[in-house]
Amino acid sequence: MCKRVLTLAALLAVCLLANGCNAAAPMWMGANVKVSANAPWESAAAAQSLDALAGTGARKALLVAFVWQANPQSNDPVLGSDSSLEAMRAALRQSHRSGLQPTLKVHVWIPGHWAGEVAPADQAAWFAAYQKALLPLAQLAEDEHAEALVVGTELRKLQDAPQWPELVAAVRKVYRGKLLYVADGMEHAETFRYWSLFDAVGTSLYPRLSDAAGARATEMNAAAQRLQDLGQRVGKPVWVAELGLRSARGSLAAPWESPEQRTAAVDTRLQLQVLQQWRKVLQAHGVDGIALWCWYTDPAAGGPGDSDFTVQGKPAQQVLAR
């Protein structure tokens, strides 16, 4: 009997090690890292902040690089001054030194607007300029061994554009890692028709939620099931590339609202409870990983008196733990 048990145990061990019998990998946790005005990517402060992020147990850093344009109708996006190749090279290298797996994540920045409003007057001209701004970042991601590259984030008015295949093909000529697009929430992720071009389904996740924990759990499970179904339908892993909640009272009614849009009393307990609940639910539905929004290069950002999204120095920082 003892010999039989040992034999079964050995077979199980071999099975788990074999490619055809994989145990479910643990869901990774990470954060979107934004540069602070007082802590540029090349600074010692930014290095300290990335070290602190790694110290939470986070595995990945999604380094936000901004492509700038003057207004939503502009046709000429360009790489932002705070996201120069030299700056982003420093960000990637410091992430590696800190023990984090870096992703370069491209966002469009429009003063007074957000990326979902990008609606160029000449779509073909916009994509040509965007590709010109993006390709040096793709080469940088290749040179500095970024794990992944996000080539677009929440471009809801452009997600059906016919230029995506050409853009992705151009990027793949210089970058061999994982390529992602991050859709603006589940509805846009479900209708995006180009997932076959990418290595994972990427989405942000800021749905309205109920105050009552029970109702909130039902809403979260429904959202997570939709993401799981989408991943299975297109045959790709799912990255929740942005998940956030302000540490502010009343933030469940509109989780996407910034402090500039609404002033509210600090509530770090709510942020912790909701992000913990999201982590549990998404893991149960097979999501590959979650990147919280957000983390700043200023190591003093956040703290118990802060009502912004960052989890730095707040109880919700523990959501990143392994």
Label every PLM stretch briefly.
Residues T56-S74, A87-L158, G250, W293-D298:
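Substrate-binding cleft and catalytic face of glycoside hydrolase catalytic domains
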Residues N22-A52:
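Boundary/entry segment of secreted carbohydrate-active catalytic domains
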Residues L8-N19:
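Bacterial N-terminal signal peptides
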Residues S84-L85, K105, L179-L180, H188-E257, ...:
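Glycoside hydrolase catalytic-domain groove-lining segments
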Residues W41, P255-E257, R269-V274, V281-R322:
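Aromatic-rich peripheral "rim/lid" segments of glycoside hydrolase catalytic domains that contact
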Residues K105-V108, A148-E154, L158-D160, V168-A189, ...:
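Aromatic-lined carbohydrate-recognition surfaces of secreted/lumenal glycan-active proteins
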Residues A44-S49, K132-L137, A183-R193, A222-L227, ...:
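Alpha-helical scaffolding within the catalytic cores
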